[in-house]
Amino acid sequence: MTEERKLYVCMRCGRIFSKSEMEILPGIRCPYCNFKIIMKVRSPMVKRIPAI
């Protein structure tokens, strides 16, 4: 079973980190600058859905 690695980016310092790195601190914060606003990095794969 492959585990999908979820990546996040800090909106202040711009560093990319994983969920396991984020769990070092209590709450949801950047492990490098302690900023609270983070964004989940989107997958580069495009999902196409057929039109009806």
From Swiss-Prot:
SUPFAM superfamilies listed in its UniProt record: RNA polymerase subunits (SSF63393)
Localization, UniProt: Cytoplasm
List of residues binding Zn(2+): 13, 30, 33
Keyword Metal-binding: yes
Required cofactor names: Zn(2+)
Cofactor stoichiometry and binding remark: Binds 1 zinc ion.
Catalytic activity: RNA(n) + a ribonucleoside 5'-triphosphate = RNA(n+1) + diphosphate
Record-listed E.C. numbers: 2.7.7.6
Gene Ontology molecular-function annotations: DNA binding; DNA-directed RNA polymerase activity; zinc ion binding
Matching SMART domains: RPOLCX (SM00659)
One annotated GO biological process: DNA-templated transcription
Record's function text: DNA-dependent RNA polymerase (RNAP) catalyzes the transcription of DNA into RNA using the four ribonucleoside triphosphates as substrates.
HAMAP family on file: RNApol_arch_Rpo12
Homology family: Belongs to the archaeal Rpo12/eukaryotic RPC10 RNA polymerase subunit family.
Quaternary structure, from the entry: Part of the RNA polymerase complex.
Protein name: DNA-directed RNA polymerase subunit Rpo12
Lineage, broadest ranks: Archaea, Thermoproteota, Thermoprotei, Thermoproteales, Thermoproteaceae
Gene field: rpo12
